[in-house]
Amino acid sequence: RRYCLNSEALEFYEEGDDLPEGARPDAEIGYFAGGCFWGVEHGFSLLPGVLDVVSGYQQGTVDRPEYKAVCAGTTGHAESVKVVFDPDVIEFGTLCKYFMYLHDPTQLNRQGPDRGTQYRSGIYTVGEKQLNIARQVLSEVQASEEFSGRQIVTELEAAKTFWAAEDYHQDYIAKTGRVCHVNIPAALKAIGRDPADLSAGH
C-alpha cells in the first residue's frame, strides 16, 4: 500500500515507511536549501502545520550521495530539507517567506562559517504553482526594506531527486542541543508569528 502525499509531485510513502504522524492524503511537500541542513530542519520543524521535516541532499548529479562526498563538492548536491506540510494550516508561500528570513539569502555558496556549493541557498519547486508562488515571494522579499542594497542569490529550480541524509543528521539540533546559523526569531516575525504561539509539540 502506498500513501500519496502530493499527487503533483508523485511523492509516495511505501507501506512500512515512516509516514509522518497526522499526514493527510492531500499534504504537500516543499524543498529548501539554506546552508547546513541541521538548522534549517529544526527551524521548519517548529511551525504548526508542518508534519515532517527530513534532512537530505538535492540538485546533484550522483545517485545516493553520502555526506563526505557532498561536503567535498564532487556531487553537485545542496544540503536541503524536505518539508511535508498541511496546506490548510500553513501555505507554501508562508513557508517560502519564513525560509527567506530563516537564513541569509544574500550569501553565495555559504552560510555563516560554512562555505561551499553544498551550502547554497535554494528553493526547489514542485510544479508550476509552487514556482510562481516562490518567484513572487522572492520578488517581494527583495523589494523589502530589510534587503535594500543586498542582492538575494537564492536559486529557484524545479526539484530533482531528494536523497535523505544519513540517520545521524536527522533531528540533529533537537538531539544535541547545538546552535546553528538560522535566525528563528526573525523568520517567525516575518510571517507574523510569536515564539509564544508555538505549541509545546513544536
Label for each model-derived stretch:
Residues 1-202:
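Flexible coil/turn and secondary-structure edge motifs
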